[in-house]
C-alpha cells in the first residue's frame, strides 16, 4: 500500500527530537503503522521493533472505547490478560481508585502518554493483583503510552521490564509517547483480511503417548490465546483460558487425527491474522504440534529493518522503495533531491547485493 505525503510528514516531524538510532527505530514503527495493516495484525511483530527504540522485556497492546475504557488487549505474556488476572484487576481498582488507571485518566496527562510509575507505590507491589500478574512475570517497571489522535483515545502500549534494567527515564518516556503517536494510523485501520505470507513466531507443542503435554513454548501459548480471543466481547466471559484448556479446544482433535494418519494440517483465520497448525505423529507415539502465524509482508519487512543500523532517512527510503514508490515519488514525499534518494538506494543495493527494487524485496523475503 503506497504511503501518502501527510503520513510521511507526520513521521518526519515526530523524529526531530530524537538521536539517530532511536529516530531510525521510530521511523520504522511509523512506516509500519502507515502501511495499511491494523495494530492487531502487527501485534506479534511489535515487541522486536519497539525494543530498538525503548529496551523492554515484554509488551502489551490495548484498545479502548471513545470514553477511554479498555475493550480489548494482547500481551506477550498471555497470563497478564488471563481471566483470573482481569478479575483481580477489577477487584484492585475497586479498592484503590488510582491503582490501575483507565485510558481516560491517562489522557488527562496529555495526548501522548500517561505514566503508571507514580502510581506503582508499595501498596501496588504488595497487592495480590501485582503478585498474580506483573510480579509473576518478573515485571517491575511499567510504562503506559496512550494512542490518542487529539479527539479520542484509541488504545495504548504497555511497556514492561524487569528490575535489572531500572525504571524508564525521561527520554524513554518521550520515546514511548512518540511510539503512541506514530501508531495512530494502525489503530484506525480496520481488521480487514490482508495477504499474509511470512511465517512468524513458531509455536511448538509436544505430547506424550498418553496425550499429556510434555513441552510447549511461549509462542504456542500466544497463538492459541489469539485464536481464543476472536469474539465480539473479548474481555468478558472469558472462562478458563489456561494453556491446557486452550490446547483442548484448538489442538486435541487435530492431534487425534495425526495419531491415526501420521500428519494433519489446519488453517485458521481471524482478526489477528492467519494461523497454520501442523500435527505430526512422533517416534514415541506422541504428537508434535507446530503453530505458525502468517503475517503480512510489512511486518516481516519491519522486523528485518529493525537492528540493521540504518539512518532514519534510509529507513524511510527503504520502505518506500519496497512498497513500490518510484525514485521521483520518494524524493517528492521526503522533500529531498532525486540525487539524495539515488545515494540511499545505491547504498541499500550494495549492502544487500541487489540491483533492482525487486532484488531488494527478494533479499528482505529470505
Map each language-model feature to its residues.
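Sensory-domain cores of signal-transduction modules, predominantly PAS/LOV
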Residues: 60, 202-205, 328
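Regulatory input/activation interfaces that engage signals or partners
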Residues: 2-171, 175, 181, 185, ...
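Recognition helix of helix-turn-helix DNA-binding domains
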Residues: 324-359
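PAS-family sensory/regulatory modules and their coupling/dimerization elements
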Residues: 245-296
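The N-cap/first-turn positions of alpha helices
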Residues: 313-317
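Short amphipathic alpha-helical boundary/capping segments
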Residues: 302-310
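Short alpha-helical interdomain "coupling" segment at the junction between an upstream regulatory sensor module
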Residues: 171, 187-201
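PAS-family sensory domains
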Residues: 200-266
Amino acid at each position: 500500500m503506497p504511503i501518502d505525503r501527510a503520513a510521511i510528514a507526520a513521521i518526519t516531524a515526530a523524529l526531530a527530537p530524537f538521536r539517530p538510532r532511536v529516530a531510525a527505530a521510530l521511523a520504522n514503527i511509523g512506516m509500519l503503522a502507515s502501511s495499511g495493516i491494523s495494530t492487531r495484525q502487527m501485534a506479534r511483530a511489535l515487541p522486536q521493533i519497539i525494543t530498538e527504540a525503548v529496551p523492554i522485556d515484554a509488551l502489551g497492546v490495548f484498545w479502548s472505547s471513545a470514553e477511554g475504557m479498555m475493550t480489548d488487549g494482547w500481551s506477550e505474556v498471555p497470563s497478564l490478560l488471563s481471566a483470573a488476572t482481569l478479575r483481580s484487576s477489577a477487584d484492585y481498582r475497586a479498592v484503590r481508585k488510582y491503582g490501575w488507571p483507565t485510558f481516560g485518566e491517562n489522557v488527562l496527562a496529555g495526548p501522548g502518554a500517561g505514566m503508571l510509575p507514580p502510581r506503582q507505590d508499595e501498596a501496588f507491589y504488595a497487592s495480590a493483583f501485582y503478585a498474580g500478574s506483573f510480579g509473576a512475570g518478573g515485571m517491575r517497571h511499567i510504562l503506559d503510552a496512550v494512542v490518542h489522535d487529539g479527539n479520542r483515545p484509541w488504545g495504548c502500549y504497555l511497556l514492561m521490564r524487569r528490575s535489572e534494567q531500572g525504571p524508564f527515564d525521561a527520554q524513554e518516556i518521550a520515546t514511548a509517547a512518540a511510539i503512541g503517536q506514530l501508531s495512530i494510523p494502525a489503530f484506525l485501520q480496520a481488521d480487514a483480511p490482508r495477504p499474509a505470507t511470512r511465517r512468524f513466531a513458531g509455536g511448538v507443542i509436544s505430547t506424550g503417548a498418553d496425550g499429556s503435554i510434555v513441552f510447549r513454548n511461549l509462542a504456542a501459548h500466544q497463538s492459541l490465546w489469539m485464536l481464543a480471543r476472536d469474539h465480539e466481547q473479548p474481555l468478558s466471559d472469558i472462562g478458563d483460558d489456561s494453556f491446557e484448556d486452550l490446547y483442548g479446544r484448538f489442538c486435541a482433535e487435530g492431534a487425534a487425527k495425526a495419531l491415526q494418519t501420521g500428519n494433519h494440517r489446519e488453517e485458521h483465520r481471524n482478526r489477528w491474522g492467519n494461523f497454520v497448525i501442523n500435527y505430526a505423529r512422533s517416534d514415541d507415539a506422541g504428537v508434535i504440534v507446530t503453530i505458525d502465524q502468517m503475517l503480512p509482508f510489512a511486518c516481516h519487512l519491519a522486523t528485518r529493518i529493525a537492528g540493521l543500523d540504518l539512518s532514519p532517512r534510509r529507513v524511510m527510503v527503504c520502505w518506500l522503495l519496497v512498497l513500490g514508490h518510484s525514485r521521483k515519488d520518494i524524493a517528492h514525499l521526503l522533500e529531498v533531491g532525486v540525487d539524495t534518494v539515488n545515494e540511499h538506494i545505491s547504498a541499500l543495493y550494495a549492502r544487500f547485493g541487489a540491483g533492482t527494487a525487486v532484488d531488494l524485496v527478494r533479499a528482505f523475503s529470505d
